A protein has these predicted regions:
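Soluble catalytic regions of large protease machineries
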Residues: 7-27, 33-197
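Conserved AAA+ ATPase small/helical "lid" subdomain
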Residues: 1-2
Length: 197
């Protein structure tokens, strides 16, 4: 599973824009990695930030070796998807303008949890009844509430594991590419605070 940060298009010859965007991308990708590692240890295989063809970009690659049908796995993926934006907001106090695809993925994951896994009760189980306007309205409210809840959970995990975030971001700023061994070494140097979903 990949999480990527692709900011709005701009002229990549504009070094002022590049110097502004790269720190945000670093913390965005570090946020994905921190939350994933706290919730599912040894789940991140690679983090990269750098120049794409026309813009700065970043990628965090996660192993997909978890039981993908479990609610814990689904909730941890939802929280991890939101962690890039949560990290950027906490570090810079701004909304993450490059997280659109992460937000879309988060809403898709939350909808699946609500419809198929009944995390908010059986009344929104999607396979039993048709999709009336009342059903769709109720589902929209519950899905939005779940995304908000897991966004707050991502922020909590990042706040409690700030040392790991800062060390990971510093290493990423220096090297631009961190492999599994690099991530493990940094993590082993930090006090990791587990957080329940």
């Amino acid at each position: 599973m990949f999480f990527g940060f692709l900011p709005p298009c701009y002229d990549d010859s504009d070094t002022d824009v590049q110097s502004i965007m790269l720190p945000e991308i670093i913390y965005h990708e570090a946020g994905h990695a921190v939350v994933s590692e706290v919730l599912c240890p040894e789940s991140v295989s690679l983090i990269y930030v750098g120049n794409g063809k026309s813009r700065e970009s970043g990628v965090t690659h996660l192993y997909n070796n978890q039981n993908t049908t479990s609610q814990y796995w689904a909730k941890s993926r939802l929280t991890t998807v939101l962690a890039g934006a949560a990290s950027t907001e906490q570090k810079f106090g701004t909304v993450d303008s490059g997280a659109h695809s992460d937000y879309e993925r988060a809403f898709d994951l939350a909808e699946k949890l609500v419809e198929e896994n009944c995390i908010d009760g059986l009344h929104l189980f999607s396979f039993k009844y048709g999709h009336s306007q009342n059903y769709l309205s109720a589902q929209e409210q519950v899905v939005t509430a779940e995304v908000e809840r897991y966004y707050r959970k991502a922020k909590e995990i990042i706040a409690l594991n700030k040392e790991f975030l800062e060390k990971l971001a510093a290493a990423l700023a220096e090297k631009k590419l961190l492999c599994e061994a690099d991530i493990k070494k940094i993590k082993d140097e930090c006090k990791i605070v587990p957080v329940a979903l």
